[in-house]
UniProtKB/Swiss-Prot annotation:
It comes from Metallosphaera sedula (strain ATCC 51363 / DSM 5348 / JCM 9185 / NBRC 15509 / TH2). Pathway: Carbohydrate degradation; glycolysis; pyruvate from D-glyceraldehyde 3-phosphate: step 3/5. Its EC number is 5.4.2.12. This is 2,3-bisphosphoglycerate-independent phosphoglycerate mutase. GO terms for molecular function: metal ion binding; phosphoglycerate mutase activity.
């Protein structure tokens, strides 16, 4: 029996609701999708609750579920995924934080939580931090630049804990917060003290940086602090190959998603031009996915643009992103061939009028190049998906892919 290779395509934040400016249609309904339309002739269609009905997923928890790991068991926080995606090599027990370069005044009151967002000097500022802050109280400190204003911070040492609060006040006009232990463990108190000492040292280094002097002269906000949030302790996850038998690879430019995939032991590729935003090079990502299919059983193509447009409330950009995803799938089929299983869905809904994640179910399409009984739907969108046969959660996806690629093993005798 032929074993088909698998293309898993996730449009981040794909799901939506009726949009007033589209006369009650959704972005998926409004988008031109010729490739997807051609695949419907041999596809199962339906709705997926990434975690469960009504549960609002994060991108981290939803991707864990989609790859077959129950987030209620395996999710330990976002920080370590972000750090792995930014290039960190973590060992069991390391504590990782998400961070933002930000601007504060001399009283450490936040003026700009992202220091202008696009910081050309970010890589050099991270290098300066790594050169000048190598340890605090015997604990090794490492900084990693993600994208734009994003920074990951990793602590390595003994008696550390992730049970500490953020220093990020999450609002402009408020002073940065002292990190506090969130339980009674001595390791938590120690870690909070280290974080507070580290924050003071970061401010000292960045406030005296010539790179920030240059930014001020140019009328730009200085990136003179790193706001920390989302502490997580690194624990090893099961590897995709071990629990599915699938050799997996991923194409993504988003640090969080790259980190999740690295945690699962997947090869991760970010081609030139892939940005993790609406300006990404879709065709470069599609070409990379097609090439990876030559050597892997499953290739995951992640597109962040749909979510970015949704958070900005830009419906036309979300429609365009969906149309470019359609073209990307077509490019993979042109380059690799159509004898593969294709699953297209979102990791969660981000309605453009809401501008936030929601607990709405997400439409899902599963193309199988064999004689299945397809669902009789006229288009792929939220409305038509309600007529399809699939009503699943994220944890069902891997089993569906294994079954329809002829790789599943019997459950029982």
């Amino acid at each position: 029996m032929k074993k088909y290779k698998i293309l898993l395509v996730i449009g981040d934040g794909l799901g939506d609701r009726q949009v007033a400016s589209l006369n009650g249609r959704t972005p998926l309904e409004n988008a031109d999708k010729p490739t997807i339309a051609s695949l419907l002739r041999s596809s199962l269609v339906g709705l997926m609750d990434p975690i469960g009905p009504g549960i609002v997923p994060g991108s981290d928890t939803s991707h864990l579920a989609i790859f077959g790991l129950d987030p209620k068991k395996y999710y330990k926080g976002r920080g370590s995924f972000e750090a792995l995606g930014a290039g960190a090599i973590l060992t069991e027990g390391d504590i990782a934080f998400r961070g933002n370069f930000a601007t504060v005044d001399s009283n450490l009151v936040v003026i700009d939580r992202r220091a202008g967002r696009k910081i050309e000097e970010a890589e050099d500022l991270v290098k300066e931090l790594n050169d000048k802050i190598q340890e605090i109280d015997g604990v090794k400190v490492r900084f990693y630049h993600g994208t734009e204003h994003r920074v990951s911070v990793v602590l390595s040492g003994d008696n550390l804990s992730d049970k500490v609060s953020d220093t990020d006040p999450h609002e402009v006009g408020k002073r940065i917060l002292n990190s506090e232990p969130t339980d009674d463990a001595l390791s938590s108190k120690r870690t909070a003290n280290i974080i507070n000492a580290l924050t003071r040292r970061i401010y000292e280094v960045l406030s005296n940086s010539q790179l920030n002097d240059k930014r001020v002269r140019e009328g730009l906000p200085p990136a003179n602090i790193v706001l920390l949030r989302g502490a997580s302790i690194h624990t090893e996850l099961p590897k995709l190959k071990d629990y599915t038998g699938l050799s997996g690879a991923a194409v993504s430019a988003t640090a969080l998603i790259k980190g999740v995939c690295k945690s699962l032991g997947m090869e991760v590729v970010t081609p030139p031009g892939a940005t993790g935003g609406i300006d990404t090079d879709y065709m470069a990502k599609a070409e990379a996915a097609a090439k990876l299919l030559e050597d892997h059983d499953l290739v995951f193509l992640h597109i962040k643009a749909t979510d970015a447009a949704s958070h900005d409330g830009k419906v036309s950009e979300k429609v365009k992103a969906i149309e470019m995803i359609d073209r990307s799938i077509g490019r993979v089929l042109d380059r690799y061939g159509s004898e593969l299983v294709v699953l297209f869905t979102g990791d969660h809904a981000t309605p453009v009028e809401l501008r936030e994640h929601s607990g709405d179910p997400v439409p899902l399409m599963l193309y199988v190049p064999t004689n299945i009984i397809p669902d009789n739907v006229g288009d792929f969108n939220e409305r038509q998906a309600r007529k399809g046969s699939l009503k699943i959660t994220g944890l069902n996806i891997i089993d569906l892919l294994l079954n329809f690629s002829n790789r599943a093993t019997k459950y029982g005798a």
